[in-house]
């Protein structure tokens, strides 16, 4: 079995290859549609000829569309392509914004000043771009009056409507009632 040495000086941009792409002698079809190293269409050629062209160019023959009839192969430096794809993935992960969920706990019988303080905390979290999980904790006989919790959560949602939207409606879960608020996107307001 012949091993191909890879040396490349070409960039391969805009080609999506799955993680299990077959290369060089692992491609087991009689003929392929060949794309050259610069993106030019070579046409349908026998697999031996395609491997020879790739070997002569010191590049790899990579199967980019295995389900096509015949499969599409491209001549490229596979090692360099994998490295650039990993760099792009790392860069996109770095640029992703981490969503943080803050939690604010309330009681059904909350005083006005305490409510204002909790509401201001929720507004501050939403302005920073965090999601907020608002939890109302019921104790004892308070559990028999879930409508108090629903009213309190609706009041809070209306008070912070300029800063956040309700992502998950109020729902009761045992002794607690929860609602999730998300920040208002800057493009929508």
Swiss-Prot record:
Keywords, sorted A to Z: Cytoplasm, Initiation factor, Protein biosynthesis
GO molecular function annotation: ribosome binding; translation initiation factor activity
Pfam families reported for this sequence: IF3_C, IF3_N
GO biological process, any: ribosome disassembly
Locations listed in the record: Cytoplasm
Protein biosynthesis in keyword set: yes
The family this protein is said to belong to: Belongs to the IF-3 family.
Protein task: IF-3 binds to the 30S ribosomal subunit and shifts the equilibrium between 70S ribosomes and their 50S and 30S subunits in favor of the free subunits, thus enhancing the availability of 30S subunits on which protein synthesis initiation begins.
Name assigned to this protein: Translation initiation factor IF-3
Native species: Corynebacterium glutamicum (strain R)
Gene name for this UniProt entry: infC
């Amino acid at each position: 079995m012949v091993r191909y040495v890879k040396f490349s000086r070409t960039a391969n941009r805009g080609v999506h290859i799955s993680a299990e792409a077959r290369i060089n002698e692992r491609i087991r079809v009689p003929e392929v549609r060949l794309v050259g190293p610069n993106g030019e269409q070579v046409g349908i050629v026998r697999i031996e000829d395609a491997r020879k062209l790739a070997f002569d160019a010191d590049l790899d023959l990579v199967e980019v569309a295995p389900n096509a009839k015949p499969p599409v192969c491209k001549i490229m430096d596979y090692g360099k392509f994998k490295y650039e794809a990993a760099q792009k993935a790392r860069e996109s992960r770095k640029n992703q914004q981490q969503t943080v969920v803050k939690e604010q706990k309330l009681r059904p019988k909350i005083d006005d000043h305490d409510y204002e303080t909790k509401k201001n905390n929720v507004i501050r979290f939403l302005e920073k771009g965090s999601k907020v999980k608002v939890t109302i904790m019921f104790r004892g006989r308070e559990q028999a009056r879930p409508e108090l919790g629903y009213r309190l959560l609706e009041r809070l949602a209306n008070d912070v409507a300029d800063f956040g939207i309700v992502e998950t409606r109020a729902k009761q879960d045992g002794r607690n009632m929860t609602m999730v608020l998300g920040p208002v996107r800057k493009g929508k307001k």
